[in-house]
Amino acid sequence: MRIKTTSLVIALLALFDLSLFGAEPPKNFTVGEFTFTRPANWESVEVTSSMRKAQLKAPGADKSQSAEVVFFHFGEGNGGGTKANVDRWLGQFEEKSNPKVEDVTVNKRRVTYVEVEGTYMSGMPGGPRTPQPKSMLQGAIIESTAENVFVKMTGPTATVKGAKEAFKKMVEAPLK
């Protein structure tokens, strides 16, 4: 009887996510030559594409209101230039309002910030698109000697606006 009870307990534990027992994803992660620290209340999630080097979730008012934060680094000679990526990101929105592009220098590194609101056309390039109205993009392109790093946060406008300062702090911290 003791063996059956032990087996049952093991089987039940296997059904639960073992991360509930203290295993927490690392707070620091490296993309290209930069080591980033995820904001404390953001969640590390498994990347959903081989093109993504890291993926986070910024919380919203509820789970359906969270924003997706993705990191890309394509390696030397790949990924396109800053202008091409800014244009592509802006092109992912219909009914755009308030598009902003700003270049800043952090410790001799150029960072191009992109911000746009409107209807985000979610989906893989060349594939079907799903319109997501009342959305916002906050993006950053970090210029690097080893090729640019691209960071893009998309989600409901209120969530992205609320996470903007944490996003900028996360992007700029490895440059200081």
Please identify what each model-predicted range represents.
Residues S7-S19:
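Bacterial N-terminal signal peptides
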Residues S64, N78-T82, P131-K134, S144, ...:
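Solvent-exposed, acidic/flexible segments
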Residues A40, S50-K53, V86-I142:
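Signature of long, low-cysteine stretches enriched in small and polar/charged residues
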Residues M1-T5:
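Positively charged n-region of N-terminal signal peptides that target proteins for export
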Residues E76-G79, G118-S122, P156-V160:
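Solvent-exposed loop/turn segments at secondary-structure junctions
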Residues F21-F29:
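Cleaved targeting-peptide boundary
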